[in-house]
């Protein structure tokens, strides 16, 4: 689902660029809230809070799970006395709603929070604004886009998840190539459209090594399961012994709930940023910036870590802090989506 959507999104953006269709903001050279969002004076925080409280509310569109979004919203409201109006959908729904409203010149949303590639697509459509936050200093330099129109607030890691009743941790290989051993045949499951993970591995290893691995993996005929959540449920139930390219967040949260699941950072660990940004025409820019600051702060980052999410901030310790990983670039994911999906379908789906 995610890979197919990413290919569709990439094609739509390419077509828009080719024929000059945009959200209608490209002709505006200056961002309307630039003075607010880029202010770095010593009174920044005091002034921002005063103005945000005058605005009273902030509208947030996110794909963060309700069980994780709700406590963060409650913490923000309790701290600042500002009401959060939250709309939640799948990542594609968030993008579609933002673009539809922008093209209709209906400026309702202040803050957008979803997957990195989707955030990058919104930046290309010029519906986001560059902004500054003092919490940028807590982020790894390689995760911050040069345009700074969106900033990573959490990281998703592709790992190996396994059922602890059927697989011993010490039996998990240290690299993905170890799963080519015939003893794993019939025990491996993959998400049905995980071409993004495949592209990250191939780009890390190089064409020769990466292509050879996925060709040989496809010959083992791994089980394909549609959706990362379903994939993790099957691992927990014992229907799948191991899942390659599983989402760390799904494995960690399942483990926290007492499921017989654990995860291993098998090399190469591919990381993908999830991001937050401020709408170019945000009706409440001060509240938008205050909420974005909060999401990047140690308080909210610590909450994400406690819920099994990978915090983007280096100021917060979590069980992903010591991971050695390769950061995928959302711009590359968008540009290469079609290529990797075609290869995935050829290898694993016989298309």
Predicted regions and their residues:
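A bilobed periplasmic-binding-protein/Venus flytrap-type ligand-binding module shared by bacterial periplasmic
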Residues: 159-166, 202-204, 272-287, 303
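Periplasmic-binding protein-like
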Residues: 138-142, 155-157, 184-193, 214-218, 223-225, 295-316, ...
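Short, polar/charged alpha-helical segment
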Residues: 42-53, 57-59, 63-83, 160, ...
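Extracellular/periplasmic bilobal clamshell ligand-binding domains
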Residues: 318-351
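Bacterial N-terminal signal peptides
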Residues: 10-21
């Amino acid at each position: 689902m995610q890979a197919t959507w990413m290919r569709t999104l990439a094609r739509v953006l390419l077509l828009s660029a080719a024929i000059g269709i945009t959200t209608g903001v490209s002709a505006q050279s200056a961002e309307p809230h630039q003075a607010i969002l880029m202010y770095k004076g010593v009174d920044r925080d005091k002034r921002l809070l005063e103005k945000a409280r005058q605005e009273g509310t902030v509208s947030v569109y996110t794909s963060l799970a309700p069980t994780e979004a709700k406590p963060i919203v409650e913490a923000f409201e309790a701290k600042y006395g500002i009401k959060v109006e939250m709309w939640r959908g799948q990542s594609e729904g968030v993008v579609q709603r933002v673009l539809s409203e922008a093209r209709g010149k209906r400026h309702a949303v202040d803050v957008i929070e979803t997957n990195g590639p989707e955030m990058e697509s919104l930046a290309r459509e010029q519906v986001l604004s560059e902004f500054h936050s003092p919490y940028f200093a807590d982020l790894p330099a390689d995760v911050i886009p040069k345009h700074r129109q969106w900033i990573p607030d959490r990281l998703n890691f592709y790992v190996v998840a396994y059922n602890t009743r059927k697989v011993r941790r010490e039996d998990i290989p240290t690299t993905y190539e170890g799963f080519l051993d015939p003893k794993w045949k019939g025990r491996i499951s993959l998400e049905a459209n995980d071409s993004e993970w495949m592209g990250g591995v191939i780009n890390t290893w190089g064409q020769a090594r990466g292509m050879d691995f996925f060709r040989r993996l496809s010959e083992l005929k791994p089980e394909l399961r549609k959706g990362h959540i379903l994939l993790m449920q099957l691992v927990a139930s014992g229907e799948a012994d191991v899942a390659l390219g599983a989402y760390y967040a799904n494995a960690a949260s399942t483990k926290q709930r007492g499921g017989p699941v654990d995860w291993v950072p098998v090399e190469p660990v591919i990381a993908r940023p999830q991001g937050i940004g401020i709408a170019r025409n945000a009706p409440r820019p001060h509240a938008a910036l205050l909420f974005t600051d909060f999401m990047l702060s140690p308080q909210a980052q610590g909450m994400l870590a406690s819920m099994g999410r990978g915090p983007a901030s280096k100021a917060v310790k979590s069980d992903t802090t010591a991971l050695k990983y390769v950061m995928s670039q959302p711009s590359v994911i968008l540009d290469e989506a079609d290529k990797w999906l075609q290869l995935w379908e050829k290898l694993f789906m016989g298309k």
